[in-house]
Design a protein with these regions (language model features):
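Gly/Thr-rich phosphate-binding beta-strand-loop-beta motif of the actin/hexokinase/Hsp70
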Residues: 1-19, 270-275
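Conserved acidic
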Residues: 21-54, 59-152, 156-354
Length: 354
């Protein structure tokens, strides 16, 4: 694995590369030939970075194909354009990129602080309209190396995400999917074809097996057209405890509750995947829903056999629901996503009542 990070200025660029297998750090400054040579030696490795999927890989590919890295950087940052749209010849360069940022929600500096490490910022402005001095380049290199070192730390703190990703690649047999998020890979594995009409978002119903009496008014709340709004919620007492029902899940807890002794914790295993299978609520973008069931059954089989391949299948099964709410994913199906959420809440309520 090669960890890497680019810093790009108008008249200068540099990259810090870390070959983790031998703990070798290398810095290349304004030298495309050196970068080409390094790439040719390591082109079959996995390239790891922080937001490299959206930025660094395109700087890398642009330099390899003779383009100006500063113009590429402006294309991505200032013009807010995707890196792949800069030049077609860059698409010919294949890199197996893994982006640590894929499974995170904050920038690198946030995690540096969270780990108790120093948050280093370079004093060299990216707006400098001249060549950098040797001293400035040295400072930028120090800052860049620090970011690579921090990326390595975060990577190993979250190595299970990487292991799961490798497992998915092994299952699909498609190494080009390495840079994708797990929800994107889920879409690929399920052969999803985007729906052309999703205007039935609030065409919801309730489980046909539902058996409610005391709390039937909660079921009716979901069927009331006045409540077809994500901002709406119902707060009501269930077995004497305030519960909130809505389109984001069921929440209920006793305030400032304290208990000393044994506490029974119960969890519904694979609730959403089970609902999607048993009530036919998988995204309608999936032409053959049996694929999802086969993946679920395969995961249970692997888990029973103590085969680690069950690990990458868990996020695929769980993230399918999230993809059904993502407009940019081919699995997007807000109606069925809403039904899954409603079914789950009402069936848990059924369990409480009965």
């Amino acid at each position: 694995m090669i960890f890497y990070d680019f810093e790009v200025f108008r008249y200068d660029w540099l990259v810090v590369l870390a070959d983790y297998s031998n703990k070798d750090f290398k810095t290349i400054v304004n030298n495309p030939d050196q970068l080409i040579e390094y790439f040719n030696v390591h082109k079959n490795d996995i390239w790891v970075g922080f937001n490299n999927k959206n930025y660094d890989q395109y700087i890398f590919k642009g330099i390899l194909t003779g383009h100006n890295p500063y113009k590429i950087s402006r294309h991505i940052i200032a013009n807010k354009m995707p890196g792949f749209s800069y030049r077609d010849d860059m698409k010919k360069i294949y890199m197996s990129n893994y982006d640590v940022y894929n499974t995170l929600q904050h920038g690198l500096k946030f995690y540096e602080g969270s780990m108790g490490d120093s948050i280093e910022e370079s004093s060299v402005s990216f707006d400098i309209d001249r060549k950098l001095t040797p001293e400035e380049l040295k400072e930028v290199e120090k800052y860049c190396r620090h970011d690579v070192e921090e990326t390595i730390k975060i990577f190993f703190k979250r190595k299970d995400d990487f292991i799961a990703q490798l497992g998915l690649i092994k299952l699909t047999g498609k190494p080009h999917l390495m840079p994708r998020t797990q929800t994107q890979i889920a879409s690929q594995m399920l052969n999803a074809e985007a729906l052309t009409d999703t205007s039935d978002e609030f065409d919801v119903d309730t489980p046909p097996t539902l058996n409610l009496s005391k709390y039937s008014y909660i079921k009716e709340w979901y069927l009331d057209s006045n409540n077809m709004n994500y901002e709406k919620s119902l707060t009501t007492k269930v077995v004497g405890v305030d519960h909130i029902f809505g389109f984001g899940g069921l929440h209920g807890a006793r305030e400032k509750y304290h208990h000393k002794g044994k506490i029974l914790v119960m969890d519904v295993a694979s609730l959403y995947p089970s609902l999607m299978i048993n009530y036919n609520l998988l995204s309608r973008a999936v032409v053959d829903p049996t694929i999802y069931k086969e993946l679920r059954d395969k995961r249970l089989q692997y888990k029973k056999e103590h085969n680690n391949l069950h690990l990458p299948l868990k996020p695929i099964l769980n993230k399918t629901y999230g993809a059904m709410k993502d407009r940019n994913n081919t699995l997007y199906d807000p109606r069925n996503a809403n039904r899954v959420c409603i079914y789950g809440q009402l069936l848990l309520l059924d369990l409480i009542e009965n």
